[in-house]
Amino acid sequence: MLLVTNDFPPRRGGIQSYLEAFVGELVRTHELTVYAPKWKGAEEYDEKAARSGYRVVRHPTTLMLPEPTVASRMKRLIGEHDIETVWFGAAAPLALLGPLARRAGARRIVASTHGHEVGWSMLPVARTALRRIGNDADVVTFVSRYTRSRFASAFGPSAALEHLPPGVDTDRFAPDPDARARMRERYGLGDRPVVVCLSRLVPRKGQDMLIRALPELRRRVPDTALAIVGGGPYLETLQRMASDLGVAEHVVFTRGIPAEELPAHHAMADVFAMPCRTRGAGLDVEGLGIVYLEASACGVPVVAGRSGGAPETVLDGKTGTVVDGTDVDAITTAVGDLLADPRRAAAMGVAGRHWALDNWQWRTRGARLAELLSGRREARQA
């Protein structure tokens, strides 16, 4: 089996985490090769991958496109390793190489979608590319029912669309009082009420709205602090905003953190909030939002934005609250209600843990992907 993708560690992001977790499940039962771009730290990562039972082949640049050099290397890998199935980790654009993969000997083509294909589906030339992918692939997977509703017509009536949302490692993401104390000590938060937003720092994620909400949150729940976890191009803008609003000393910017510290940073939260919003006339949208489920698995109540598939990760009113990510008053109310009522927040956290355990296990998701990759079972209508 060959995974061809632009999105793979050690580069970090939502798609990278999604694919890495599925690879971890697949290697239990499959021989797997990953073809991905080079990235800082790749040599060390690839050595660990080899010890875990799969090989990673790196393209010499940091971006792979459906062009001759990538096509040639892919075809060579198919021949060298007797590849029967090629899985394109993100359908757009690399799954345009599907016909070449078949001619090189692959018998089955699977292409996974995320959130950016929604934007592609709104552009005429890109829609044509998606139609070609839908016509050629044996299966096209989607992470949320929202994304399916937005791009299904672009992939065309012959596309076999299958629901393949991510899972959560509920052993790794779990309530952890020791980690909570350790992280709070690291950032000097003590016993303060803490709101955590863990995400790449880009406008869609809504960190700016949490900073705007913080003055009123602090009036309602004294001593509240906001921890913005992650790195990204929006950092300096957010820092200026916190300073302009007079709350800079109450906002912690951790910048990027190691992947192994993600659960510990969730653990320090009283509330997890990422009030995402759709931007760019619908081109920039939240495909699903696994981070909400990771917070739930850690026993933390969540506040999610009503963007794309994000509401599918929350049982509204039970594991958290879904709000309009453009409405600072709604965000303030949702977060403030949870901070002001620790008993209710704790009950939502417990419900979230059960939600993750009962419905979002990686083992179940991995078994379904293995079926789709092998073709052992007929594709089921989503």
UniProtKB/Swiss-Prot annotation:
InterPro entries: Glyco_trans_1, Glyco_trans_4-like_N, Glycosyltransferase_grp1. Coiled coil: none annotated. Keywords: Glycosyltransferase, Lipid biosynthesis, Lipid metabolism, Phospholipid biosynthesis, Phospholipid metabolism, Transferase, Virulence. GO terms for molecular function: glycolipid 1,6-alpha-mannosyltransferase activity; phosphatidylinositol alpha-mannosyltransferase activity. One of its GO terms (cellular component) is membrane. GDP-alpha-D-mannose binds at R200, K205, I257, E294. Transmembrane segments: none annotated. Pathway: Phospholipid metabolism; phosphatidylinositol metabolism. Its EC number is 2.4.1.346. The keyword Membrane does not apply. One of its GO terms (biological process) is phospholipid biosynthetic process. It is an enzyme of class 2 (transferase). It catalyses: a 1,2-diacyl-sn-glycero-3-phospho-[alpha-D-mannopyranosyl-(1<->6)-D-myo-inositol] + GDP-alpha-D-mannose = a 2,6-O-bis(alpha-D-mannopyranosyl)-1-phosphatidyl-1D-myo-inositol + GDP + H(+); a 1,2-diacyl-sn-glycero-3-phospho-[alpha-D-6-acyl-mannopyranosyl-(1<->6)-D-myo-inositol] + GDP-alpha-D-mannose = a 2-O-(alpha-D-mannosyl)-6-O-(6-O-acyl-alpha-D-mannosyl)-1-phosphatidyl-1D-myo-inositol + GDP + H(+). Involved in the biosynthesis of phosphatidyl-myo-inositol mannosides (PIM) which are early precursors in the biosynthesis of lipomannans (LM) and lipoarabinomannans (LAM). Catalyzes the addition of a mannosyl residue from GDP-D-mannose (GDP-Man) to the position 6 of a phosphatidyl-myo-inositol bearing an alpha-1,2-linked mannose residue (PIM1) to generate phosphatidyl-myo-inositol bearing alpha-1,2- and alpha-1,6-linked mannose residues (Ac1PIM2). Belongs to the glycosyltransferase group 1 family. Glycosyltransferase 4 subfamily. This is GDP-mannose-dependent alpha-(1-6)-phosphatidylinositol monomannoside mannosyltransferase. It comes from Mycolicibacterium smegmatis (strain ATCC 700084 / mc(2)155).
